[in-house]
């Protein structure tokens, strides 16, 4: 039986443009949870190898990786928003995102907040002078002409995006600066990967009870339990032996990180559902876009930095 849109009662593949085509393209050579598993594993191992080598031999290169990820992920979301009719000031958003992460190097959290604040202010002004129908050529600005329409919608989406990607990712960069910074980054990334792998595996094998079916039909309570078990085990070990924290801090951190990973995934799923798309991009075979792999990492980075900084 086809899923229906809760607001209209019409079949979901008819009520949300692009879903039917995306579903048809994604079902070929994919398992139950919708991934091309061999490609996903190959890409995941490649990314993991780069991260491990970076953190072991040159930890500060992590900031470069964060900056690159911010640019690519922000561009993916901007493109999708524009396809849906939003008028997003991409130039100041992408440049401001770089300032947000790079200012963490000399100024730490103050730099991240200053970069984010400046990005928001410039984007709000930029949107005022953009042509509503100029989605590809932002240099065509005008201080006169027809009144700006949908300003609140577009400005709100821009501020949301500036917080969601550059600001949240800057906390991932902040993790690497202390003496045990590499261990802290390992703690974050291993926790996220363990939560994702545990949830995916258990969900595919045993998932029967949907977690939030109206947002993400493939997620199940059984998968969440798998995330909790795997994420908790991995985080306690990494927080204790790599970040130098007590086991109770690792246990508390693990529980919160599993929640933020799951909620981050659900937030991106809802955004994609609003936009009528399956993936943010096609950069990573078996995964979708880069943003589709960062959905759980971004909010988890904020939590990881906060708890690893404040707790003994």
Curated annotation (Swiss-Prot):
Residue span of region Disordered: 1-31
Enzyme nomenclature, EC number: 2.7.7.41
Primary subcellular site in the record, as a coarse category: membrane
Membrane association type: Multi-pass membrane protein
Superkingdom field: Bacteria
One term under GO cellular component: plasma membrane
GO biological process: CDP-diacylglycerol biosynthetic process
InterPro entries associated with the record: PC_trans
Pathway(s) where this gene product acts: Phospholipid metabolism; CDP-diacylglycerol biosynthesis; CDP-diacylglycerol from sn-glycerol 3-phosphate: step 3/3
Keyword Oxidoreductase attributed: no
Locations listed in the record: Cell membrane
UniProt entry keywords in alphabetical sequence: Cell membrane, Lipid biosynthesis, Lipid metabolism, Membrane, Nucleotidyltransferase, Phospholipid biosynthesis, Phospholipid metabolism, Transferase, Transmembrane, Transmembrane helix
First-level EC class: transferase
Annotated family: Belongs to the CDS family.
Protein name: Phosphatidate cytidylyltransferase
Organism field: Mycobacterium leprae (strain TN)
Source organism phylogeny: Bacteria, Bacillati, Actinomycetota, Actinomycetes, Mycobacteriales
């Amino acid at each position: 039986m086809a899923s229906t849109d809760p607001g209209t009662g019409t079949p979901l593949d008819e009520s949300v443009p692009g879903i039917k085509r995306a579903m048809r393209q994604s079902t070929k050579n994919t398992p139950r949870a919708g991934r091309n598993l061999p490609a996903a594993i190959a890409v995941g191992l490649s990314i993991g190898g780069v991260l491990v080598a970076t953190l072991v031999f040159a930890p500060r290169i992590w900031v470069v990786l964060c900056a690159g990820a911010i640019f690519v992920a922000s561009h993916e979301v901007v493109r999708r928003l524009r396809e849906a009719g939003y008028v997003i000031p991409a130039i100041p958003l992408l440049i401001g995102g770089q300032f947000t992460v790079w200012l963490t190097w000399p100024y730490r959290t103050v730099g991240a907040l200053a970069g984010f604040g400046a990005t928001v202010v410039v984007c709000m002004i930029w949107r005022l002078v953009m042509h509503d129908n100029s989605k590809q050529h932002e240099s065509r600005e005008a201080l006169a002409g027809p009144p700006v329409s949908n300003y609140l919608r577009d400005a709100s989406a821009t501020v949301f995006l500036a917080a969601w990607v550059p600001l949240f990712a800057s906390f991932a960069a902040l993790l690497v600066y202390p003496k045990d910074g590499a261990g802290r980054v390992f703690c974050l990334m291993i926790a996220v990967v363990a939560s994702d792998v545990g949830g995916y595996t258990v969900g595919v094998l045993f998932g029967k009870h949907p977690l939030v079916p109206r947002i993400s039909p493939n997620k199940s309570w059984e998968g969440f339990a798998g995330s909790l078990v795997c994420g908790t085990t991995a985080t306690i070990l990494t927080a204790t032996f790599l970040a130098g924290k007590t086991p109770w801090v690792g246990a508390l951190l693990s529980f919160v990180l599993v929640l933020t990973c799951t909620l981050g995934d659900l937030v991106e799923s809802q955004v994609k559902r609003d936009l009528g798309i399956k993936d943010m991009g096609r950069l990573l075979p078996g995964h979708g876009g880069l943003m589709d792999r960062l959905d759980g990492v971004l909010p988890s980075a904020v939590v990881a930095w906060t708890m690893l900084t404040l707790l003994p």
